């Protein structure tokens, strides 16, 4: 039995790393001597980059550049964009029409969206997604580290959906972070619902209830992580700032 509680955290995208590594989230987690963190990145270059800045005896980096592809993986990866109906989604469809000038594509997209963007359809799709998509990309890491929890810092991405599925199969606690104020209404449905969702504010919480189908009690309003520095960190004087950037005082 390991003496550590291991947490998987995704930093596949820059905004994820900003929200986790460059805020007090990382500092707070690593301050607990019994916590071990495994960060998932897309490339060896990113692994080296973060290792140099955030290296620690209890921090590990694993590279996952892609997930297993197949018909059902591609099918549900495409279908998720048809499963929510918002003004932003309609605007993006109109913008695509202006670019491609395809009336057929516009009409089919509009019709599918209106037919499929319902809570009960999303629930069915998530169940079928779990059943039909066979992807064991992350299994080796679960066997290796035996995590106690998984944090997906961008659960809308397919590679992170794959990680969440593996955790769900193993009955491991999962957390998701909606890392932008407009991610829920402007992108797509979640293929996998984490056990808990962290959002920036009450407006995003309402969006998560309306469009992501999250129960009210499973959503935590945590604020914007990278804004904490404006309160917690000491302010530079004007002269110090100009000196820092090489400006003329």
State the predicted function of each range.
Residues 4, 24-35:
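A short, Lys/Arg-enriched amphipathic alpha-helix followed by its capping loop at the start of a domain
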Residues 139-141, 165, 184-196:
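Membrane-proximal helix-turn-helix segments that form the acceptor-binding/catalytic region
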């Amino acid at each position: 039995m390991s003496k550590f509680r291991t947490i998987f955290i995704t930093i596949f995208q820059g905004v994820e790393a900003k929200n986790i590594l460059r805020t007090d989230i990382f500092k707070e987690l690593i301050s607990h001597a019994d916590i071990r963190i495994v960060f998932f990145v897309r490339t060896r270059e990113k692994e080296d980059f973060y290792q140099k800045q955030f290296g620690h005896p209890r921090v590990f980096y694993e590279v996952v550049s892609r997930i297993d592809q197949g018909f059902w993986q591609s099918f549900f990866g495409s279908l998720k964009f048809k499963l929510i109906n918002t003004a932003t989604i309609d605007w993006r469809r109109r913008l695509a029409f202006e670019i491609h000038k395809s009336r057929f594509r516009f009409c089919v997209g509009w019709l599918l969206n209106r037919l499929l963007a319902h809570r009960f359809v999303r629930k069915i799709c998530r169940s079928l997604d779990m059943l039909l998509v066979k992807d064991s990309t992350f299994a080796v890491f679960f066997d290796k580290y035996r995590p106690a929890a998984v944090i997906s810092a961008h659960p809308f991405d397919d590679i992170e959906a794959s990680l969440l599925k593996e955790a769900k199969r193993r009955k491991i606690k999962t957390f998701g972070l909606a890392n932008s104020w407009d991610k829920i209404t402007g992108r797509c449905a979640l293929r996998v619902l984490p056990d808990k969702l962290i959002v920036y504010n009450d407006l995003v919480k309402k969006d998560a209830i309306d469009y992501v189908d999250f129960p009210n009690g499973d959503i935590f309003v945590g604020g914007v992580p990278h804004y904490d520095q404006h309160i917690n960190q000491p302010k530079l004087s004007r002269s110090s700032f100009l000196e820092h950037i090489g400006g003329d005082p």
